[in-house]
């Protein structure tokens, strides 16, 4: 009698586990994780914005908004590159996303950027432009951020918890 009850329960348990695995796999199915279009404008190697230090293993993605509202992705990229001459600080990002959703890659993903202090050595950084002081992204910036982040997560086998 116990065997008759256990077999259907085992089948039900296996079905529920299978269903859970399928749902988890499809959790991000509606997100475009293809490589987004980007303009690669690598910074010159220098001690202030692109040290040329290789990242051993990417353990996460850090997202910031820029410190200068209303600026463009190109403005921010050029500022980072200009630090080699001004020496005013150490700052950079692997990617900058502009107000229109344009993406500029400033540093290769296998190299360290100066974006997040303690996590520079094991993360990829993304700076997002925003139009005003409230820091809210434009829809175009947000869409590009989602696609870029999804692509990087797929490329480096990262989870949402690592963003």
Walk through the language-model features, giving the residues of each.
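N-terminal catalytic cores of peptidoglycan-degrading enzymes
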Residues: 2-117
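Long, well-ordered alpha-helical scaffolding segments within enzyme catalytic domains
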Residues: 90, 122-163
């Amino acid at each position: 009698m116990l065997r008759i009850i256990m077999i259907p329960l085992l089948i039900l348990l296996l079905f529920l586990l299978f269903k859970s695995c399928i749902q988890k796999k499809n959790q991000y199915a509606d997100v475009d994780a293809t490589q987004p279009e980007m303009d690669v404008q690598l910074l010159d190697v220098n001690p202030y914005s692109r040290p040329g230090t290789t990242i051993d293993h990417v353990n996460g993605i850090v997202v910031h908004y820029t410190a200068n509202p209303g600026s463009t992705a190109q403005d921010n990229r050029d500022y980072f590159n200009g630090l080699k001459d001004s020496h005013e600080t150490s700052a950079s990002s692997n990617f900058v996303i502009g107000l229109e959703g344009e993406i500029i890659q400033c540093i290769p993903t296998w190299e360290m950027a100066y974006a997040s202090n303690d996590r520079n050595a094991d993360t990829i950084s993304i700076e997002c432009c925003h139009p005003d002081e409230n820091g809210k992204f434009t829809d175009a910036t947000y869409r590009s951020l989602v696609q870029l982040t999804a692509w990087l997560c797929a490329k480096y086998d990262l989870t949402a918890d690592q963003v």
